Each structure stands twice: as structure tokens, then as C-alpha cells.
UniProtKB/Swiss-Prot annotation:
Involved in protein N-glycosylation. Essential for the second step of the dolichol-linked oligosaccharide pathway. Present with 1950 molecules/cell in log phase SD medium. Signal peptide: none annotated. Heterodimer with ALG14 to form a functional enzyme. This is UDP-N-acetylglucosamine transferase subunit ALG13. It catalyses: an N-acetyl-alpha-D-glucosaminyl-diphospho-di-trans,poly-cis-dolichol + UDP-N-acetyl-alpha-D-glucosamine = an N,N'-diacetylchitobiosyl-diphospho-di-trans,poly-cis-dolichol + UDP + H(+). GO terms for molecular function: identical protein binding; N-acetylglucosaminyldiphosphodolichol N-acetylglucosaminyltransferase activity. It comes from Saccharomyces cerevisiae (strain ATCC 204508 / S288c). Its EC number is 2.4.1.141.
Length: 202
């Protein structure tokens, strides 16, 4: 498979609770090889609060090397928490930070594909910006609302969904490169909002 264009994947774990399984899977050799095969050259990871040292350790475990090149911190809205690395013998740049005040800008301007935890706000951010989205459910959380929400969006044809495993994420990535999702209705949609509320509280 030839590389047609240089693409970026944005992974968001949410603002509060870290999602170590998701971060570990997207940094695995198998997943990164698949990314490169599909023409991705940049992996941007928003990993959540109080996870910086674990993230750095994980990247270094996978052979990542710190890069001194200046990151567009102003555009990313992440203060001085951002770190940049190279993986896979320099074929993949990895940018990681804990939190951003400009998530929608990152999704709109720096992402060709988004992998998100199953928080409703994060899902809607990507869909409203017309970005293809893979939803990864955090199965370590106490309730199953995330699973219900993800299932409903999948049923409606707006997203792909996967478990936080290498196999699941690779399957989601492959689907995103070969299938098309239904366009999300960006205008105010009371019936959809009611459906979402019913799903969350059912």
C-alpha cells in the first residue's frame, strides 16, 4: 500500500481520568506500524491529568526519542506540558500533553482522524467538526454509560467503536480507512438530543 498523503491521528483520553490502556495500545509497535502503512506521520495524544511521567516512561519504553523541535504550544493550548518524540526509526512523530484549552482547534486544524474516549462532549466535538471518529470505551469505569453512548452512535452510523486493545484499535483504524460514516447533522437537533439523554439515563 503506497502512502498517498501525510496524515495526523489525534487521540483524546478526556480531561480528568487517564486512560492508560488506550495510550498503551496506540503506542504499541503493531498499531504504529499500521498507522505508518496508512500514511500517518503524526500521533497527537491528550492523555489526561497526572499522567505525564507515566506517558514519558511508556514512550521511552517503546523506543521513543525526545525531539527538541519547537511545538506550536499556542495553537495547541496546552501550556508547557507538551512533549515531542520520534518513534519507529523516525517515521512517526508523537506529541503528548495532559490537557488543552483548544481541543476543537486541534481536532479541526491538526487531525485527519480522531480516537476518543466515550465521553459525550468529546464525541460531539469531533462529529460537529466532521472528523472521522473511532470511539474507545474505557471498560475500567464503574458504570456502563460510555458503552451505551458508544453503541448508540455506532447504531446511528456516525462512529466506529472498539475496545481498548491493540486488536480492537487496529480493526477500527482499518475500518476508518476503508469505510464511510454517515454525516452528522450539525444543526440543532432536539430529537437526537432527547435520544442521547434517554440513552444516558436508561
Amino acid at each position: 500500500m503506497g502512502i498517498i498523503e501525510e496524515k495526523a491521528l489525534f487521540v483524546t483520553c478526556g480531561a480528568t481520568v487517564p486512560f492508560p490502556k488506550l495510550v498503551s495500545c496506540v503506542l504499541s509497535d503493531e498499531f504504529c506500524q499500521e498507522l505508518i502503512q496508512y500514511g500517518f506521520v503524526r500521533l497527537i495524544i491528550q492523555f489526561g491529568r497526572n499522567y505525564s511521567s507515566e506517558f514519558e516512561h511508556l514512550v521511552q519504553e517503546r523506543g521513543g526519542q525526545r525531539e527538541s523541535q519547537k511545538i506550536p504550544i499556542d495553537q495547541f493550548g496546552c501550556g508547557d506540558t507538551a512533549r515531542q518524540y520520534v518513534l519507529m526509526n523516525g517515521k512517526l512523530k508523537v506529541i503528548g500533553f495532559d490537557f488543552s484549552t483548544k481541543m476543537q482547534s486541534i481536532i479541526r486544524d491538526y487531525s485527519d482522524l480522531v480516537i476518543s474516549h466515550a465521553g459525550t462532549g468529546s464525541i460531539l466535538d469531533s462529529l460537529r467538526l466532521n472528523k472521522p471518529l473511532i470511539v474507545c470505551v474505557n471498560d475500567s469505569l464503574m458504570d456502563n454509560h460510555q458503552q451505551q453512548i458508544a453503541d448508540k452512535f455506532v447504531e446511528l452510523g456516525y462512529v466506529w467503536s472498539c475496545a481498548p486493545t491493540e486488536t480492537g484499535l487496529i480493526a477500527g483504524l482499518r475500518a476508518s480507512q476503508t469505510e464511510k460514516l454517515k454525516p452528522f447533522p450539525v444543526s440543532h437537533n432536539p430529537s437526537f438530543e432527547r435520544l442521547l439523554v434517554e440513552t444516558i439515563y436508561s
